[in-house]
A protein has these predicted regions:
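Active-site rim/loop-helix segments in enzyme catalytic domains that contact anionic ligands
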Residues: 1-116, 143-144, 148
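Metal-dependent de-N-acetylase/amidase catalytic core
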Residues: 1-6, 90-91, 95, 99-198
Length: 198
């Protein structure tokens, strides 16, 4: 059975990093895939070759190219700004996703789910993988949108993307040149990184 699968991501590039393989597989298996980006990624790292292009324009262009590469033809934007990392002053900027009212953001997402007749919604785990405030907000908004759909008799199967801490630790130990990152250490917000295989 062909399903409509909606992937909700926090920032441009998260679609490739977190679920690129799942997106490509779903497209390959004939499912309709809709990619929804919560933010514009305005506080990401600025590449040296940016020139006159704004970071938002670059990240949007890169996301459009990524979607095409993955086989996605339906890309949506919820319209929020990147909140920056935990504790950054950008957390308090107007329009920052972390400041968005969860119900209002969930209504925006639910409207997309309704429009595309979504069968499956994929968001992040409770910690957003590594504690980024926008990733945690994706979890909240995704769950609330699924609840809204259920309350209206149009349920959606909700799945969560996470990072496999056990596998990442194994890969790091097998490549001793990878120094400076220990997945067993807490993330910036003090919570564990990803999830274990247990």
């Amino acid at each position: 059975r062909v399903s409509t699968v909606v992937f909700l991501h926090a920032h441009p590039d998260d679609e490739s990093i977190a679920t690129g393989g799942s997106i490509a597989r779903a497209v390959h298996e004939g499912h309709r895939v809709v990619l929804v980006m919560a933010t514009d990624g305005c506080h990401g790292e600025k590449p040296a070759d940016l020139g006159d292009e704004t970071l938002v324009a670059r990240r949007r262009r890169e996301t459009e190219a990524s979607a095409r590469t993955l086989g996605v033809t339906d890309l949506r934007w919820l319209g929020y700004h990147d909140s920056g990392m935990t504790g950054w002053p950008q957390n308090d900027e107007p329009g920052a996703f972390i400041r968005a009212d969860v119900d209002e953001a969930a209504e925006r997402l639910a409207a997309i789910l309704d429009e595309v007749s979504a069968d499956v919604l994929i968001c992040y785990d409770w910690h957003g993988g590594y504690g980024h405030p926008d990733h945690i907000q994706v979890h909240r908004v995704g769950h609330r949108a699924a609840d809204l759909r259920a309350e209206r008799g149009r349920g959606v199967r909700l799945l969560e993307s996470t990072m496999n801490r056990t596998r990442i630790a194994r890969m790091m130990s097998e490549n001793p040149g990878n120094e400076g990152f220990d997945p067993e250490q807490p993330a910036d917000d003090g919570n564990p990184f990803g999830s274990t295989e247990d």
